[in-house]
Swiss-Prot record:
Reactions the enzyme catalyzes: 2 reduced [2Fe-2S]-[ferredoxin] + NADP(+) + H(+) = 2 oxidized [2Fe-2S]-[ferredoxin] + NADPH
Binding site for NADP(+): 145, 165, 221, 253-254, 283-284, 293, 322-323, 361
SUPFAM superfamilies: Ferredoxin reductase-like, C-terminal NADP-linked domain, Riboflavin synthase domain-like
Alphabetized Pfam families for the sequence: NAD_binding_1
Keyword Transcription regulation: no
Residues reported to bind FAD: 142-145, 163-165, 169, 180-182, 221
Name of the protein this chain belongs to: Ferredoxin--NADP reductase, chloroplastic
Membrane protein topology class: Peripheral membrane protein
Transit peptide: 1-52
Location(s) in or outside the cell: Plastid, Chloroplast stroma; Plastid, Chloroplast thylakoid membrane
Cofactor: FAD
Length: 363
């Protein structure tokens, strides 16, 4: 749209003024000034008048850039079931998967969903334990990472599995305290009802690229999402997905009797030795060359240079799940070797996070 505008401009006295018009204006609409024929303006102490035509052009519409995730997020469902209206499933089996001499019990449990809780690998569900709290209100839900692939342990898409450690500790007053939800779950008998919410979460979803390098760092029950990944990669057949990349699992536990799903992972390694690497860190039984306890970051330090080279690739994805303390230890390792490349690790990690290549779920 064009508009003609007349502007009166007071000019300082001058014998002769040649007035080229060059104007730049920032406004919501772009203003285009067209020069009117005017060689000079004679001024006799009076106000001169300049006529200018101003053409306004509307700004081009802004096109919204849609970010495409590198993760398997198409059609993902979140929060289908809420605490006030949970899905009520039943416990099919509940098995202790740690040895009798392990420091604490961990249980693997399977619940029915009848396909009504459409979760993905890497998501979590909420559990609302039976009973009421000290204020007479229903217990609040607790979130647990799902330990089964999207089609479940039985391959029929009708179950969901969890990996839960029973929480029991002695407080400062010398009283034995039992975690409400973990003990509720570990004590479940087959046939018992369980209230399920969710599914929730997108942080830990698997990468879309079947040729990706997937580095998994887990401690204790933080192994849950990685079991779901690895079942899909190595135990299942899908028409639209076949993993051809490298999966590298680091699992940290206190004792060998605490190694979770060890036999499953060893079978995967036998089945796909070129695609699956497995490293355990058993802190109370193993030490490194310096005599230091073998925590997950200690084990990773043995492969620091190799891991760094993998992290330079744009199709390497790191997933971390488990105890929060592991994150600082891993940062310390990377910081110690990065000066060789002149790269600031903390800044580089931010870049990886932005690219969805560094994914953390710790507690």
């Amino acid at each position: 749209m064009a508009a003609a505008v007349t502007a009166a401009v007071s000019l300082p006295y001058s014998n002769s003024t040649s007035l080229p018009i060059r104007t730049s204006i920032v406004a919501p609409e772009r203003l285009v000034f067209k020069k009117v024929s005017l060689n000079s303006v004679s001024i006799s102490g009076r106000v001169g008048t300049i006529r200018a035509q101003i053409t306004t052009e509307a700004e081009a519409p802004v096109t919204k850039v849609v970010k495409h995730s590198k993760k398997q997020d198409e059609g993902i469902v979140v929060n289908k079931f809420k605490p006030k209206e949970p899905y009520v499933g039943r416990c099919l089996l509940n098995t202790k998967i740690t040895g009798d001499d392990a420091p604490g019990e961990t249980w693997h449990m399977v619940f029915t969903t009848e396909g009504e809780v459409p979760y993905r690998e890497g998501q979590s569900i909420g559990i609302v334990p039976d009973g009421i709290d000290k204020n007479g209100k229903p217990h609040k839900l607790r979130l647990y990472s799902i330990a089964s692939s999207a089609i479940g342990d039985f391959g029929d898409s009708k179950t969901v599995s969890l990996c839960v450690k029973r929480l029991v500790y002695t407080n400062d007053a010398g009283e034995v305290v039992k975690g409400v939800c973990s003990n509720f779950l570990c004590d479940l008998k087959p046939g018992s009802e369980v209230k399920i919410t969710g599914p929730v979460g997108k942080e830990m979803l698997m990468p879309k690229d079947p040729n990706a390098t997937v580095i998994m760092l887990g401690t204790g029950t933080g192994i849950a999402p990685f079991r779901s990944f690895l079942w899909k990669m190595f135990f299942e057949k899908h028409e639209d997905y076949k993993f051809n990349g490298l999966a590298w699992l680091f699992l940290g536990v206190p004792t060998s009797s605490s190694l979770l799903y060890k036999e499953e992972f060893e079978k995967m390694k036998e089945k796909a030795p070129e695609n699956f690497r497995l490293d355990f860190a058993v802190s109370r039984e193993q030490v490194n060359d310096k005599g230091e306890k073998m925590y997950i970051q200690t084990r990773m330090a043995q492969y620091a240079e190799e891991l760094w080279e993998l992290l330079k690739k744009d199709n390497t994805f790191v997933y971390m799940c488990g105890l929060k303390g592991m994150e600082k230890g891993i940062d310390d390792i990377m910081v110690s070797i990065r000066p060789k490349d002149g790269i600031d690790w903390i800044e580089y990690k931010r870049t990886l996070k932005k690219a969805e290549q560094w994914n953390v779920e710790v507690y």
